[in-house]
Amino acid sequence: MTSTPTKPTVAFAHLGCEKNRVDTEHMVGLLAEAGYGVSTDESDAAVVVVNTCSFIQDAREESVRTLVELAEQGKELIIAGCLAQHFQEELLESIPEAKAIVGTGDYQHIVDVLQRVEVGERVNRVSAVPTFVGDEHLPRQRTTDQAVAFLKVAEGCDYRCAFCIIPKLRGDQRSRPIESIVAEAHQLAAQGVQELILISQITTNYGLDLYGKPKLAELLRALGDVEIPWIRVHYAYPTGLTPDVLAAYREVPNVVPYLDLPLQHSHPEMLRAMNRPWQADVNDRLLDQIREQLPDAVLRTTLIVGFPGETEEHFQHLMGFLERQRFDHVGVFTFSPEDGTAAADLPDRVDPEVAQARKDALMALQQPISAERNSRWVGRTVDVLIEQHNPQTGEMIGRCARFAPEVDGEVRVQPGAEGQQAAPGSLVPVEITGADIYDLNGQMVGARAMVAAIRADA
């Protein structure tokens, strides 16, 4: 990603989640519109904007390590994102090469910040309480694959989970109007996007602050008119999956039946300790309801082990839940105590070695389940979004709708029987021929094969 500058080139280093990525893309778009060159290669520029993550300690350490490495290369730094929001003036004091800090609610001011840095100022542009949310009018230059785009439907979070610092870093929830989201979706469709991923902190709570009640179902139906084949929803909290939302999943053809459910735990006592008591009587009942209404639904969840007070009984409850519910994809994290969260001061810490052993046990339990869930797709012909192509061998790599980018598996695609191949960004039919724990194998299907298969099934 490089543009022709009329002003100096600014490099970008992106860290953290896809919500952070959208903020990066807006900053890139704003600087490009103002005439700056923008690049992802730090060697191209004297000034580097680092959009940082501060969600957990490991992420903070990665952000600080990146900042120190760039500082030692002699770069001038503009520190943006969650680390800037978290530590603010302390960063300017600790890193002399840091010329500015930009908070999570202030990235729209990046051009002004850079102009002030250019005349020698050290700038602190961090609002105490973030209130801004970008929209379709804010310039944006995407940094993701040409065919995939993330669309932020809301910013911030009204929940106060005991382990999570995000509300302090990004403020309370503030949703965009449906019309604004649909307008941006049309813009992205015009750019050739094939997969649109809706994101926020709690996507199923979309609209609650703006309309007085959640409006995800209405949003999905409105997006049904956008010419993008796949619309995927991330961060669907269980209580927000109402019958109307599940009906929208069924009714809107381009909404893929993929549910990303960050459940965190199954035991009621653990959920109360996590300040998620509303979820305790929902998990099993909701999952049964989802499978009844969306038989082909792909279910992903994330879980936390080693939360303070988690006993062996609590953990075995979670093991039983995982074995019973048979998710397609599971991510497991060990508890990370974060200063400024309620959980940071809780007693009865779990030994880190015990927490790691529990994580390993959950993943060992899940792997054959994931393999079995994948094997159900062998013999089917599905659409695959091609993301890589080897012109020498003809082999392709892509994803079908059951795999979200970066967090799930991939489909390894062989050329069709008549030599058919496809370029990245193409959505093509593929017959699934094999499966393993995480990935699928397949062969591209030509028109003749598709006609023959349909006639054989008739």
From Swiss-Prot:
Q: What keywords tag this UniProt record?
A: 4Fe-4S, Cytoplasm, Iron, Iron-sulfur, Metal-binding, S-adenosyl-L-methionine, Transferase
Q: Cite the GO molecular-function annotations of the record.
A: 4 iron, 4 sulfur cluster binding; aspartic acid methylthiotransferase activity; metal ion binding; protein methylthiotransferase activity
The EC number(s) attached to this protein equal 2.8.4.4
Report domain TRAM positions. Answer: 375-446
Task: Identify one Pfam family in the record.
Answer: Radical_SAM
Q: Which cofactor does it need?
A: [4Fe-4S] cluster
Q: Does the keyword 4Fe-4S apply?
A: yes
For binding [4Fe-4S] cluster 1, which residues are annotated in this chain's numbering?
17, 53, 82
- What detail does the entry give on cofactor binding? Binds 2 [4Fe-4S] clusters. One cluster is coordinated with 3 cysteines and an exchangeable S-adenosyl-L-methionine.
Q: Which residues bind [4Fe-4S] cluster 2?
A: 157, 161, 164
MTTase N-terminal domain residues are 8-119
Which SMART domains does the record match to this protein? Elp3
Q: Which Gene3D superfamilies match?
A: Methylthiotransferase, N-terminal domain, Nucleic acid-binding proteins, tm_1862 like domain
GO cellular component terms listed in the entry, alphabetical order = cytosol
Function of the molecule: Catalyzes the methylthiolation of an aspartic acid residue of ribosomal protein uS12.
Q: Which PANTHER family match?
A: RIBOSOMAL PROTEIN S12 METHYLTHIOTRANSFERASE RIMO, RIBOSOMAL PROTEIN US12 METHYLTHIOTRANSFERASE RIMO
Protein name per Swiss-Prot or TrEMBL:
Ribosomal protein uS12 methylthiotransferase RimO
What is the organism lineage in this UniProt record? Answer: Bacteria, Bacillati, Cyanobacteriota, Cyanophyceae, Synechococcales
